[in-house]
């Protein structure tokens, strides 16, 4: 695999069949760096198959979490390799930053995107997650459609916002949004009411959508990226 500068992955690339996403709780900015450096080192020396297209590590701006976002051509090989590589990564992380906890990996497929090709390169990635009370692929898509309809009805997009990419988990229970922003301040300003994020009846309906049991938003910065398959 080739090391690359920490640039944003191409979320819409057509050969990305699945995204494997995992969240880690680090607790401090220093432990975030230790976790990412350890995981990055373990992956760089691994025999990674060409079906891994990209792997990106993001650190939350509050110093609490790390997110890994891996693009693969197919889910089966992704999950198989992730189990093998996961042991090496966990050992490396435990040696460098003991006590870090991780959530189970979740498989997603991109469903829809709202592109802003004129937007500048993102300095902040806002990850939103929604979990439902059971599997229902139609409900996942209906929720995303509602949100995108609400965003498209805005009179003018927020100046700091970029493209937004909505994913559905392959088990039918979750939705993940990957939103690009110029910087953290732009997103904070928008959600505080000086922009359009969170305004309007469509967004209100999305928040009150039946069956939602958990939802959250976290702001991240891209820290490390590795490209496979000749990409990134």
Predicted ranges, named:
Residues 1-232:
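Short S/T/G/P-rich N-terminal loop/turn motif that feeds into the first structured element of a domain
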């Amino acid at each position: 695999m080739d090391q690359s500068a920490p640039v944003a992955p191409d979320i819409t690339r057509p050969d990305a069949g699945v995204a494997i996403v995992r969240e880690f709780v680090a607790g401090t900015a220093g432990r975030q760096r230790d976790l990412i450096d350890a995981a990055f080192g373990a992956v760089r020396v691994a025999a990674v198959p060409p079906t891994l297209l990209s792997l990106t590590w993001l650190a939350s701006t509050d110093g609490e979490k790390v997110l890994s976002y891996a693009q693969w051509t197919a889910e089966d090989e992704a999950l198989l390799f992730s189990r093998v590589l996961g042991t090496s990564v966990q050992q490396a992380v435990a040696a460098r930053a003991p006590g870090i906890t991780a959530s189970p990996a979740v498989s997603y497929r991109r469903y829809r995107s709202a592109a802003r090709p004129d937007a500048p390169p993102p300095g902040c990635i806002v990850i939103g997650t929604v979990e439902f009370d059971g599997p229902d692929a139609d409900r996942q898509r209906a929720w995303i459609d509602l949100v995108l309809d609400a965003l498209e009805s805005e009179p003018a997009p927020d100046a700091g916002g970029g493209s937004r990419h909505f994913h559905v988990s392959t088990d039918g229970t979750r939705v993940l949004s990957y939103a690009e922003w110029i910087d953290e301040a732009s997103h904070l300003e928008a959600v505080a009411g000086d922009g359009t994020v969170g305004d309007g009846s469509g967004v209100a309906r999305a928040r009150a959508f039946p069956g939602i049991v958990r939802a959250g938003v976290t702001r991240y910065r891209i820290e490390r990226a590795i490209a496979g398959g000749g990409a990134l």
